A protein has these predicted regions:
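N-terminal metal-binding scaffold of metallo-dependent hydrolase/deaminase domains
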Residues: 1-43
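Divalent-metal coordination cores built from histidine and acidic residues
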Residues: 70-147
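A generic fold-level signal
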Residues: 21-22, 52, 140
Length: 147
């Protein structure tokens, strides 16, 4: 048994994403970094038994680019195991956006409630990719985003 100290240890069937067969094992996390994956039993400050453990999934065609910018918790994606969104691959995306397109966005998103107070035109402060990225950085998001 390893004598290393981990902040978090997950135990369960590991699907490592390499195409190898899944195996019973342990994942050790120190801080925000995975520092151990293997079959040797390890323990940590917090130990969680999980039915299955895998790398985060990538959603390669998503429409959450606006919701991500307005509510960075990304809960619906994270609960599904999606840790990275590839966005902006449709004609209806938040970048580039200008005042002429704002009415189109407002009409499309009117029924959505990202912030608890309803969708407002003033929620969008950017017009280009750099501004969108700066907004994500400033507001903070719980997922990776590849626009």
């Amino acid at each position: 048994m390893s004598t290393a100290t981990y902040d978090l240890v997950l135990s369960g069937v590991i699907y490592d994403g390499t195409g190898a067969k899944p195996f019973e094992g342990y994942v050790g996390v120190t801080g925000e970094t995975i520092t151990y994956v293997g079959k040797e039993k390890i323990t940590g400050k917090e130990n969680i038994a999980a039915p299955a453990i895998s790398a985060g999934f990538i959603d390669i065609h998503t429409h959450s680019d606006l919701s991500m910018a307005l509510d960075g918790r990304c809960e619906s994606k994270l609960f599904q195991g999606v840790t990275t969104d590839v966005s902006g691959n449709c004609a209806f995306g938040p970048v580039p956006i200008n005042r002429e397109r704002m009415a189109e966005h407002t009409a499309h998103l009117q029924g959505m409630d990202f912030t608890g107070g309803g969708y407002q035109e003033s929620d969008i402060s950017w017009s280009d990719l750099d501004g969108y990225r700066a907004t994500l950085e400033k507001r903070g998001i719980a997922q990776n985003n590849a626009p």
